[in-house]
Regions:
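A detector of single, family-specific signature residues
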Residues: 1-229
């Protein structure tokens, strides 16, 4: 069993702490509109910056509701400030890390995905072959086999959920985002036409894991005009 380095454990703590604060902010933002709807108050479409002003405007004539909602808004404000601190810390860490900067040369890979991959893999020498990375993190189909039949099922979902989710989000950006055309996107679009978008996203996530590991191992940036793998 691989024992993560202290630096990797610090990076993971930063990622999970940032995610925790972000999730709590989202919980408040998602819960309040539904709660206020019970009083006939409709929040409507509003961005994060104007969210608090909109809520306070709605409850201004409802003193009891305002007294209850006020602490939630104050808690949200504090959470957003602390989330911002961790997010800036993360961006600075990525900016000064040459491995993360190299990983970000790949399509769909931003600071969060790069740092997550760097943290979870920790040491590329752990994997003798780049193709092992996708299987290790649960992005390969399960094989069901008996004496009479052999079929593949859904992905195994073993390994680190944080990395698997990050790769999935990166793959979604590759396939649906407006970014520069590249061989990985072309391959993923072809898979989507044959097998559907959901399977294409998983396939691109798996291939992206292979590409990122190879880039890290070989100290090379993503080659936009060359074959991906």
């Amino acid at each position: 069993m691989h024992v993560k380095t202290p630096a990797s454990q610090h990076r993971r703590l930063l990622l999970t702490s940032r995610k925790l604060l972000q999730r709590k902010v989202y919980d408040i933002e998602n819960d309040l509109p539904g709660s206020l709807r019970n009083f006939g108050l409709k929040v409507g479409v509003v961005g994060a910056v104007k969210f608090e002003d909109r809520i306070r405007e709605l409850v201004a004539d409802h003193p009891v509701v305002a007294a209850i909602v006020g602490p939630l808004l104050e808690a949200r404000a504090v959470l957003r400030i602390q989330f911002g601190k961790l997010h800036r810390m993360l961006l600075e860490l990525v900016r000064t890390d040459p491995i993360c900067r190299r990983l970000m040369s790949a399509p769909g890979v931003g600071p969060i995905v790069a740092l997550t991959f760097r943290t979870c893999v920790d040491n590329p020498a752990r994997f003798s072959r780049s193709k092992c990375v996708g299987a290790h993190y649960g992005l390969t189909p399960r094989l069901y086999q008996s004496s009479e039949i052999a079929r593949t099922g859904r992905i195994s979902r073993c390994g680190d959920l944080m990395l698997r989710s990050s790769l999935y989000e990166a793959a979604l950006v590759v396939l649906t985002g407006p970014g520069r055309w590249n061989s990985l996107k072309a391959w993923g679009i072809a898979v989507a036409r044959r097998r559907g978008m959901q399977k294409a996203i998983v396939a691109v996530a798996r291939k992206l894991a292979i590409i990122l590991h190879r880039m890290w191992r070989d100290n090379t940036d993503f080659r936009w005009t060359a074959p991906s793998v």
